[in-house]
Amino acid sequence: MTTTLQQRGSASLWEKFCQWITSTENRIYVGWFGVLMIPTLLTATTCFIIAFIAAPPVDIDGIREPVAGSLLYGNNIVSGAVVPSSNAIGLHFYPIWEAASLDEWLYNGGPYQLVIFHFLIGVFCYMGREWELSYRLGMRPWICVAFSAPVAAATAVFLIYPIGQGSFSDGMPLGISGTFNFMIVFQAEHNILMHPFHMLGVAGVFGGSLFSAMHGSLVTSSLVRETTETESQNYGYKFGQEEETYNIVAAHGYFGRLIFQYASFNNSRSLHFFLGAWPVVGIWFTALGVSTMAFNLNGFNFNQSILDSQGRVINTWADILNRANLGFEVMHERNAHNFPLDLAAGEQAPVALQAPAING
């Protein structure tokens, strides 16, 4: 019997590149999604920083009244923002080469589109990269599923909402005060506080914070003692150790007696699934709510829904909220609303004093 040994030919440059891209031995995993993620996020970050510092005022409402958003034009960290592209641009794709000059591109808010489009592509690829690394390591894919919640929220406010409203000028400004302005105007125009999907999102975020604090404090309070009183309890854990670092039975017994037995998980896996799923599902619903309100399927309207025997309105908190909404609405984009028909909040003029008789 003869055995022939043949030396394997050296890998091509492309094969070496592919091996490096998909290698899990790199300090930071790149992956094929990373090939697109890295340049897009770098572009979005670079443009955002430059625009936040030095961009000239933007004609956001399309009425030749520019709004300054950068630091060099008088803003601070809190009031500054990358101002959304002009209402005169609407939903048109507005890259630099579509403008007659760089000055025109800046005046019409071109940097906003550049930032959000590259940012969205980047976070989509980041989510895909999470799946890709999980796949390479033989892990389950739930990390990218959890990250899909903030991705959905960002997509809703930066892409879906402007599409529904017909202009990228309605997108969320890229700044602290701009975010608050977006929230207030959103409430005025869509009554988001009265939308059940927003309520589910609030329950998801606040509930997730509560459950996280409860879980962390329970675990910290039931650690297995491995150190003396003079040492930090953190030294009692060695990375990769096989034994449990806390007593789940003690934690279960404590919480079961504090509330009631079945309020406490006795399965660590189902507990951590719950901790992950609760806020994710809540944020999914909020993103879905914003996406439906983008097309003006708004929150509940209970205005003037309670009348006395004489037909007079008995105000509820819904009516108080409506008055706040009207105040928000009348104060935003003041010069763009020449005929604010949506603020016709005066006394109603009766068009028929009594219903006509129908003989049938």
From Swiss-Prot:
- Organism superkingdom: Bacteria
Q: Which GO terms describe its molecular function?
A: chlorophyll binding; electron transporter, transferring electrons within the cyclic electron transport pathway of photosynthesis activity; iron ion binding; oxidoreductase activity, acting on diphenols and related substances as donors, oxygen as acceptor; oxygen evolving activity
Positions that bind a quinone: 215, 264-265
| Stretches that traverse the bilayer | 29-46, 118-133, 142-156, 197-218, 274-288
Name the gene behind this protein.
Answer: psbA2
Its taxonomic path starts at: Bacteria, Bacillati, Cyanobacteriota, Cyanophyceae, Oscillatoriophycideae
Q: Which family does it belong to?
A: Belongs to the reaction center PufL/M/PsbA/D family.
Q: What is this protein called?
A: Photosystem II protein D1 2
What PTMs does it carry?
A: Tyr-161 forms a radical intermediate that is referred to as redox-active TyrZ, YZ or Y-Z.
Q: Topologically, how does it sit relative to the membrane?
A: Multi-pass membrane protein
EC number(s) of the enzyme? 1.10.3.9
Question: Which residues make up the binding site for Fe cation?
Answer: 215, 272
The cellular component terms of Gene Ontology attached to this UniProt record, alphabetical and capped at eight, are: photosystem II; plasma membrane-derived thylakoid membrane
